[in-house]
Amino acid sequence: MTTVVHGASQVVRVDADGLDVVEGGSVAIEDGTVAAVGPTDDVEQEYPVEGADTTVDAAGQTVLPGYVDPHTHAVFAGERVDEFAMKLRGRSYQDIQAEGGGILSTVRAVRESSCTELRDHLLAHLDVMLAYGTTTAEVKSGYGLSLDAERKLLEAVARANERHPIDLVPTFLGAHAVPADAEPDAYVDRVVDEQLPSIADADLAVFCDVFCDEGAFTHDQSRRILEAGIDHGLTPKIHAEEFDHRNGAKLAAELGAASADHLLQATPDDAAAMAEASVTPVLLPGTAFALDVPYADPTLFQDAGLSVALATDFNPNCYSQSMEFAMSLACNGMRMAPADALRGATQHAAEALALTDGTGTLQEGAPGDLVVADVPRFEYIPYNAGVRTTETVLKSGEVVHRD
């Protein structure tokens, strides 16, 4: 099957050499894979519109790679809108959780939900993500905090992945918080001895993550969990240096993690260690926005030679499914250049998920995952903050969303 997206104002080519804008460009996709990218006349000489099975007229619009969201908590039950008002009155994240709210509130809702209910709730969120241009997304567990509930969450992710165009990458985050009925070290024992073996044996996750921070898990507890994950074939990831500095970024470097995420309290030494080990920093500007705290500093990592990835951190406490909004916050809040933000939301986001098939790029041989944005140049996407610019989304060359 041949798909031709033709006559665009801009085609944003993204590959190992960086970002290159083709003015007046087209893209041809053959059997799900990008076959040609370039000026419209050149592409259509080999792939004429008249002979294509599917065509997308992108006149006046911009074509770019489908967004990759490398950090979400999109599978959950219940909402926490009441806590939104509490935060606006000055209550901290830690205060709310200490009173049984926050993560523990969502845990209660998840434990009361069926796998089918969790799957359907996730599918609804994925529909929103797709409308905003996301074509690949990581989804973490972590709102179960027991073997049965964590398995239920990851089984819901697997079932949703069978039904939805967005490719889902599952992450086990049993160490998201300490359950209300457990002592921290005893719960770590349960994660290591019960949850991890069961999750790995069922092939329900690719990554093992841990929340190494104040009110969650210590450095030593995090090490134990991630090393156990490695023993079971799961690549490590880590929530690090969000509220407190616990050397989580250096632990990520030591263990060869795919990414270290959040990093609001990271230091130049952390960035240097991550660079030495090629650990991708994943910055989550939506979280800083939701918590009303200072943003992470992307230059800390860029100066160390690292490429910065962006993610939504979509969860009940950071309720945005939009990578467009994440890019806008990255530019306006973290002062990232639009080109860096776009690569962070595509190419570098895919690197944070250890994807090596060309996902997140737009080049010959890459998956035919595209966004057609209703703007004349890509800089309008972060510039026009809060407005959805995505009009058409293609997955493997098939139109899966169109306004």
Task: Label each PLM-derived region with a short phrase.
Residues 49-50, 58-121:
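Metal-associated gating/positioning segment near the N- to mid-region
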Residues 345-347, 367-403:
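C-terminal cap of metal-dependent C-N hydrolases
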Residues 89, 147-151, 216-222, 267-276, ...:
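Active-site-adjacent beta->alpha loops and helix N-cap segments on the catalytic face
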Residues 109-121, 135-243:
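Metal-coordinating catalytic core of metallo-dependent amide/deamination hydrolases
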